[in-house]
C-alpha cells in the first residue's frame, strides 16, 4: 500500500521539513527551503584526504595578508663564516683589505683558519672588519580551481543514492592530489643538492651500460654520501610534521630526515645492503610508534625515514639509450632509461603560501548550486543543471634550498 503523507496546507503555521522524498507535498513547500547537507560530505572527504597527504605534512603555512599583493618576500641572512657571505668589507688583522670579508669562510683547513683569526694588538685600530650578506627570497600565490556539472535527473534516478557525496569526495581528492603534485614538482625543481648515482654527472648520462658497479643504481654508499652533504649544510636531523584532520597539530620525529621515493624504487631500498653486506633496510614494524609515523612510511635506512609516494614523479626517457639493460631496467620512449628521484626534504626547508587559510591547511572554497530556481537562467531556462566548483590559492616559498636534495637513480624492473 502506498504511503500517505500529510499536506503542507495543513501546517501553514509551522516550519516544515521539506523531505525531498515526499514528492506529493512539494507543491506548497515551506519557506525553510530545500534540504541538503553538503557540509557532511565535505567533512568526511577532508578526513579521508589527510591520509593521502605526503608533502603537505612537512610544511607550515605562511599566510598572505589581504590587500598586500600576491608575492611574499623574506630576508635570508647568511652566516658570517660561510663562503656564500661575499662582500667587500674585509680588513685583516694587519688592516689590509682581503677578498670576501668573511674571515676564513667555510674553510676547515687548519692552516687557513689559524692564519685568519681576528687577533688584536694593544692599540686596536681599524683591523678585522667583516661584512654580512643577506638574500631576498620570494614566492607568489596563484588561484587554482575546477568545476563539474550534474543534472536533476542524475540526482533523482541514478543507481547510487550517494552520487553527490561521491562527487564531492572525488573532487576534494582531486584538489588534494593537484596540491601535492604542485608541491612535489616545486621541491624537485628547487632542490639545492643534486646527487647522481654510478658514474653519471647528470640525468642525460644515467646508464646501466658500463662495467659492474658503475651502473646508475642507488647504493648504501650514495645514501651515506648524501647524509654527509646535508650535515655539512646544517640540515636539521629532526623533522616536524603536521598531523590531525584539521592539520594544526605538530609532532617532531627525532634524529631522522625524510626521504620520498616512488614505488619503482621500493624493492631496491628493501634489498639494499650496507658496507658489511648486512641488510641496511629496517622495516617500519621494527620501530613503529603510531604517534610518530609519516603517511606512507615503510622503513628506515641510515639517518633517513623512507616514505613511498604512489604518485611520485620521474623523468621519462631522460637517460642514455638502453642496450644491455633493456628489459632489466625501466625505460621510456626510444628505449632510453627513465630516471627516478629519491627526494629528501629537511624540516622547515619550505613553506606553503596561503590566503585566508586555517591552521596549516589549504582553504578550499566550494560553491554548489543544485538544479532548480537557483541555476535557471536564459541558458538553462528549466534549471535542469546544477554545478559545484572548488578553488584555492597555492604558492610555495623555498626557504632553504640546501636542505632539499634529490638523489637520482635508475629502477630495476
Segments from the language model and where they lie:
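Assembly/oligomerization interface modules of large self-assembling protein complexes
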Residues: 57-144
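Short acidic, glycine/tyrosine-flanked loop/strand segments centered on an H-E-D-like triad
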Residues: 129-158, 353-365, 370
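Structured, hydrophobic secondary-structure cores that serve as assembly/anchoring elements
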Residues: 142, 148-152, 156-158, 162, ...
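Exposed beta-sheet edge/beta-hairpin loop segments within beta-rich domains
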Residues: 63-66, 156-166, 250-253, 373-385, ...
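Sequence/fold signature of self-assembling virion shell proteins
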Residues: 2-58, 203-244, 254-413
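Amphipathic alpha-helical scaffolding segments
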Residues: 91-95, 164-173, 276-280
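Alpha-helical scaffold segments that mediate packing/assembly in large oligomeric complexes
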Residues: 154-243
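Hydrophobic alpha-helical segments involved in membrane association or supramolecular assembly
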Residues: 74, 169, 173, 181, ...
Amino acid at each position: 500500500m502506498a504511503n500517505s503523507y500529510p499536506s503542507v496546507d495543513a501546517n501553514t503555521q509551522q516550519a516544515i521539513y521539506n523531505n525531498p522524498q515526499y514528492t506529493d507535498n512539494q507543491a506548497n513547500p515551506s519557506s525553510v527551503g530545500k534540504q541538503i547537507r553538503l557540509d557532511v560530505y565535505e567533512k568526511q572527504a577532508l578526513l579521508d584526504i589527510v591520509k593521502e597527504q605526503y608533502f603537505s605534512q612537512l610544511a607550515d603555512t605562511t599566510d598572505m595578508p589581504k590587500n598586500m599583493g600576491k608575492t611574499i618576500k623574506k630576508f635570508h641572512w647568511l652566516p658570517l663564516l660561510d663562503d656564500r657571505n661575499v662582500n667587500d668589507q674585509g680588513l685583516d688583522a694587519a688592516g689590509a683589505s682581503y677578498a670576501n670579508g668573511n674571515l676564513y669562510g667555510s674553510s676547515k683547513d687548519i692552516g687557513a683558519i689559524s692564519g685568519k683569526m681576528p687577533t688584536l694588538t694593544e692599540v686596536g685600530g681599524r683591523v678585522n672588519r667583516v661584512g654580512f650578506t643577506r638574500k631576498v627570497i620570494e614566492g607568489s600565490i596563484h588561484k587554482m580551481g575546477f568545476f563539474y556539472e550534474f543534472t536533476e535527473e542524475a540526482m533523482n534516478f541514478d543507481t547510487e543514492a550517494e552520487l553527490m557525496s561521491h562527487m564531492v569526495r572525488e573532487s576534494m581528492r582531486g584538489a588534494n592530489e593537484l596540491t601535492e603534485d604542485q608541491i612535489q614538482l616545486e621541491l624537485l625543481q628547487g632542490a639545492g643538492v643534486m646527487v647522481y648515482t654510478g658514474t653519471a654527472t647528470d640525468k642525460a648520462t644515467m646508464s646501466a651500460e658500463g662495467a659492474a658497479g658503475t651502473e646508475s643504481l642507488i647504493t648504501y654508499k650514495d645514501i651515506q654520501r648524501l647524509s654527509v652533504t646535508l650535515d655539512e649544510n646544517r640540515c636539521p636531523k629532526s623533522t616536524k610534521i603536521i598531523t590531525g584532520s584539521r592539520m594544526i597539530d605538530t609532532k617532531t620525529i627525532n634524529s631522522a630526515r625524510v626521504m620520498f621515493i616512488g614505488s619503482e624504487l621500493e624493492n631496491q631500498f628493501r634489498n639494499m645492503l650496507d658496507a658489511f653486506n648486512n641488510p641496511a633496510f629496517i622495516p617500519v614494524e621494527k620501530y613503529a610508534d603510531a604517534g610518530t609515523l609519516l603517511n606512507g612510511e615503510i622503513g628506515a635506512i641510515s639517518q633517513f625515514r623512507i616514505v613511498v609516494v604512489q604518485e611520485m614523479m620521474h623523468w621519462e626517457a631522460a637517460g642514455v639509450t638502453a642496450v644491455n639493460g633493456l628489459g632489466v631496467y625501466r625505460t621510456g620512449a626510444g628505449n632510453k632509461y627513465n630516471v627516478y628521484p629519491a627526494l629528501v626534504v629537511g624540516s622547515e626547508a619550505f613553506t606553503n603560501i596561503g590566503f585566508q587559510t586555517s591552521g596549516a591547511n589549504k582553504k578550499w572554497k566550494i560553491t554548489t548550486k543544485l538544479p532548480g530556481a537557483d541555476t535557471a537562467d536564459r541558458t538553462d531556462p528549466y534549471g535542469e543543471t546544477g554545478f559545484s566548483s572548488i578553488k584555492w590559492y597555492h604558492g610555495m616559498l623555498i626557504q632553504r634550498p640546501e636542505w632539499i636534495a634529490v638523489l637520482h637513480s635508475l629502477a630495476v624492473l
